């Protein structure tokens, strides 16, 4: 029944405009809507024979393999070892004959940890290393169109790159294995827009970087901005040189409604790529908000010219029955809980969340610290460069994201600090969420787990102080102990950026 539903969804999409991106899910869309694949686990529970598994999922929660806690090596010392079983997946699928001649990618939203992909027995590309990031392969030349195709995926629980294990798995949380976020195909024409990066300011200035691919001639980009009622408020045409990597669109929109946590006003940019004769080549839409982020050194954090203090919590992507693989309902429950507690911010500890959670933060009004994995140890520069790129390009147009966090508590590879701005057209600030004094960055001290008196001292220093973890049950006399006293200190201080408690 699920396969029939997916097939009907594909046919419905094909009936639409062929110049848009077309999607076909191979897995389910979340933990509550899964698709059964063939699965072989190499060690641990239910290993050694081909069985069935739901995708997306963490295989431990499906009864396979072995459980690991990331700090077991601290508890058990030299006798500790991480289980390192592999999971081998197989799935057969068809793609429409009409997709022949298009660019077809297979996209993984998250897979723990090293992921090797084959289509019809042929490699799709290099093994991907890093669990929490969207990655894709161009499989256009590997497919049988309108015939059965065989997808084979081998997932290694532990990475062959020691720095990836250090950043993601030797950590104070449960570590899992498996394809835990959706897998889908995307098909585009040969001439298309890869992605856009939007920088929309509170005064109505709108700038957008348009990254095109495969242009056979000079072209035109027509950008139409609509408000929440679908009213057109601006249209602008921009010439595109076929030899240019990207094109910048500029305009100013009057009488806009700004985005903040209290007024999460969203707009839609419809971006159409046309040839010189006006024929539509491709179209995409992107939601965004008009807002300006400022770090005023020694003063505070300002959104749209108004000082804002974060009343935030740290959040893991976790549900007891499904681990890191979440349902849309799980995500909504967390987002609503944040709003119901009168919080205005969330730190994505300690890795990028599902994209749907960011969409909820956009629409409900929650400020976000989007974090590269790095729990007290960092990715190598070689590994981290790709993962920063994948994180930023996926997330760059969410108005809720106001900071990029380059790792946690010493897991900061400072050689990656400049990489965020290379892909983020709006140049959001980068911070270091840390637990040692002296690690302030971009004018913000984020030092964790200070006591009341040291908090007073830091707030009287020259830097903005925004502890990105505080009031841990093990470190501060009980979870939430003296919350009112700490908050009053921050509320009265000009230099406070607010706080993030541990944890949601």
Sequence positions of predicted segments:
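Substrate-binding/catalytic cleft of secreted carbohydrate-active enzymes
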Residues: 335-338, 345-504
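Accessory beta-strand-rich segments of carbohydrate-active enzymes
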Residues: 40-44, 79, 84-193, 215, ...
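N-terminal carbohydrate-binding accessory modules
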Residues: 22-29, 196-199, 258, 270-339
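Bacterial Sec-dependent N-terminal signal peptides
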Residues: 1-22
């Amino acid at each position: 029944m699920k396969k029939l539903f997916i097939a009907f969804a594909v046919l419905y999409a094909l009936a639409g405009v062929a110049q848009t991106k077309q999607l076909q899910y191979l897995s389910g869309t979340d933990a509550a809507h899964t698709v059964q694949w063939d699965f072989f686990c190499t060690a641990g529970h239910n290993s050694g024979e081909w069985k069935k598994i739901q995708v997306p999922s963490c295989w431990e929660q499906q009864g396979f393999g072995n459980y690991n806690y990331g700090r077991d090596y601290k508890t058990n010392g030299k006798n500790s070892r991480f289980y390192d079983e592999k999971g081998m997946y197989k799935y057969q699928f068809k793609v429409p004959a009409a997709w022949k001649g298009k660019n077809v990618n297979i996209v993984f939203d998250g897979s723990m940890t090293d992921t090797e992909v084959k289509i019809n027995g042929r490699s799709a590309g290099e093994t991907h290393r890093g669990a929490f990031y969207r990655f894709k392969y161009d499989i256009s030349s590997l497919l049988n169109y309108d015939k059965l195709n065989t997808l084979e995926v081998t997932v290694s629980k532990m990475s062959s790159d020691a720095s990836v294990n250090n950043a993601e798995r030797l950590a104070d949380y449960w570590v899992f294995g498996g394809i835990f976020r959706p897998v889908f195909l995307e098909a585009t024409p040969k001439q298309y827009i890869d992605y856009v990066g939007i920088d929309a300011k509170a005064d109505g200035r709108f700038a957008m970087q348009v990254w095109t691919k495969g242009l056979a001639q000079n072209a035109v980009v027509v950008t139409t901005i609509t408000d929440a009622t679908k009213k057109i408020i601006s249209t602008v045409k921009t010439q595109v040189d076929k030899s240019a990597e990207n094109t910048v669109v500029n305009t100013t929109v009057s009488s806009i409604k700004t985005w903040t946590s209290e007024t999460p006003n969203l707009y839609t940019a419809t971006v159409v790529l046309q040839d010189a004769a006006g024929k539509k080549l491709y179209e995409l839409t992107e939601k965004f908000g008009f807002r300006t982020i400022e770090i005023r050194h020694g003063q505070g954090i300002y959104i749209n010219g108004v000082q804002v203090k974060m009343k935030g919590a740290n959040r893991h992507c976790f549900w007891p029955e499904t681990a890191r693989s979440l349902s849309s309902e799980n995500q909504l429950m967390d987002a609503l809980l944040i709003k119901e507690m009168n919080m205005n911010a969330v730190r994505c500890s300690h890795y990028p969340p599902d994209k749907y959670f960011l969409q909820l933060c956009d629409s409900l009004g929650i400020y976000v610290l989007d974090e590269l994995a790095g729990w007290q140890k960092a990715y190598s520069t070689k590994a981290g460069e790709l993962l920063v790129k994948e994180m930023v390009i996926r997330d760059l147009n969410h108005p809720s994201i106001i900071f990029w966090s380059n790792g946690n508590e010493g897991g900061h590879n400072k050689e990656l600090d400049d990489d965020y701005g290379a892909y983020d057209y709006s140049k959001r600030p980068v911070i270091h969420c840390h637990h040692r004094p002296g690690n302030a960055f971009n004018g913000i001290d984020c030092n964790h787990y200070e006591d009341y008196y040291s908090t007073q001292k830091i707030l009287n220093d020259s830097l903005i102080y925004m502890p990105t973890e505080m009031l841990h049950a093990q470190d501060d006399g009980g979870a939430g102990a003296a919350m009112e006293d700490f908050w009053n200190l921050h509320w009265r201080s000009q230099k406070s950026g607010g706080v993030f408690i541990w944890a949601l």
